[in-house]
Amino acid sequence: MSDSGNNFFILRRLFGFTKPYRSILWTSTFLAILLAPLNALTPYLTHLMVDNHIMKADLPGLQKMALLFVLVLITTTGLRYLFTILTNTLGQNVIKDIRNKVFAHLLGMKLAYFDKTPVGTNTTRTVNDLESVNVVFAEGLITIMADVLGLLTILGMMFYTSVKLTFISLVSFPLLLIASYIFKEKVKVSYQRVRTEVARMNSFLQEHISGMRIVQIFTAEKKIAAKFKSINKTYTRANLDGIFYYAVFFPVVEIISAASLGFMVWWGAKGVLGGAVTVGQLVAFPMFIARLFQPVRMLADKFNSLQMGLIAGGRIFHTLDNQEKDYDSGNIHLDKLKGEVVFDRVSFSYDGITPVLNDISFTLEAGKSLAIVGSTGSGKSTMISILNRLYEVENGVISIDGINIKEYDLETLRGNIGLVLQDVFLFYGSVYDNISLNNPNISHQQIEEASKTIGADIFFKVLPGGYEYQVTERGSNLSMGQRQLISFVRALVYQPNILILDEATSSIDNQTEAIIQNAIDKLTKGRTSIIIAHRLSTIKNVDKILVLEKGKIVESGSQQELLAHPNGLFSRLYLTHFDPIQA
């Protein structure tokens, strides 16, 4: 069993994040210790007021005691307010730090992790689970410690006031402890189910809202709605189970408390009549019982809150402990690479079983262009991914400028490779932000000059607000051509020496097509270029073409050389698959 599943270990790790806020932690702890006797003091003061002053008609003494009583109440209220503020401040600051750490950790994970982990699960870890962890500080350990100290202080004060009345009051106490234990165990199981269903629901919503276009195109709304209703029903049932346990537990506690109080009053009244119990003791003990049963009732709830926070903490640490980090950087750091790319007997599979690339070898000289063609699933996009070290090759070597890409640090490698994908991912923000990716070293002037260079400036300036136009999530308020142009400008401003272009297969208007072709010509000029080609206008100008089939290179050469073999795969693809648009 991993340490991340051990409650004590989770608690220790969570409190490790309190180091920058130790002053708040220790002040909260001190207040918890201070509040314990103050909470038990008011019933005892009531006992003294009745027996020593009211029963003896000592008005001056009663006034002094009443003033002390009010002072204790005001002090207790003020300290409890400060305690609540401090514990919640501690919790929010710790959650802020953990959330930053979780997100930074996710940014450094391999793509393989995201391939198998639903987006909703990571969202739940970063948002929902961390809100539950906040309970560990706001309502958890420190508050539980305060309640336990208060409980012990009240018991001590009760015994000091009257041993007999204390034992009478505690007759039903074992029943309360048993009820609290059963409640704690039942709610713990219920909460685990709720958290599991929340993650499942988040994943489902994230996936289907992102894919709403497909859902609507294939008129799958009713089926998706039915599936969501099923997930939602399971989630609701898990919540109702927890509500049921709460609905049963608190009335049971009230019944036990009322029975204890009634029995104590009956026995105490007999004691008053017989002279064994004073009136002040009888008046004070209902207050003692209320203060005794309240923390016990709340402790069961708070233990569950703590348990919920620890379960959520365990899930968070499971993510943080996941070692599927991005591949280690090498030690070679260079500002610019020349751009010679060599694949030497490279093989790769995503699952370690089914080969996607098999014994791929080719050399692309610096400044030359290469087109990769092949049917869907032949391995074209995979070659791009392993060149960027988004995945690691299993066999063979990929080198740039004669050096294994594993020896370059990732900043050098990826910083020298410009990537233009056919599925352009845009973030919510301005056109400027989507081009610069919030890089402060890229100025507005550079972006505008790059846009003019490839002819995209006219498209951006007609947008409301121009370059400040707010792009919605995934660029849904832009056309396919506009999204493509943003990716071209993005590649140009970063000035890579190696360009990888995955041409879009979607049809666009002739004007945009001409600008995109011009952009391709400008981007590839003088750069090592690898193009996954879908248009004749692109492949006719490249220096070399690779033809892939089932992860293997089956043909290579120039367009003229490959077309010289009419029965070859390239000739067949040329006639049946390529978009005949000419630049």
Q: What residues fall within each predicted segment?
A:
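ABC-type nucleotide-binding domain
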Residues: 328, 334-583
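Transmembrane helices of ABC transporter permease
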Residues: 20, 24-35, 67-72, 76, ...
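Hydrophobic alpha-helical segments in the permease module
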Residues: 69-80, 173-177, 246-260, 266, ...
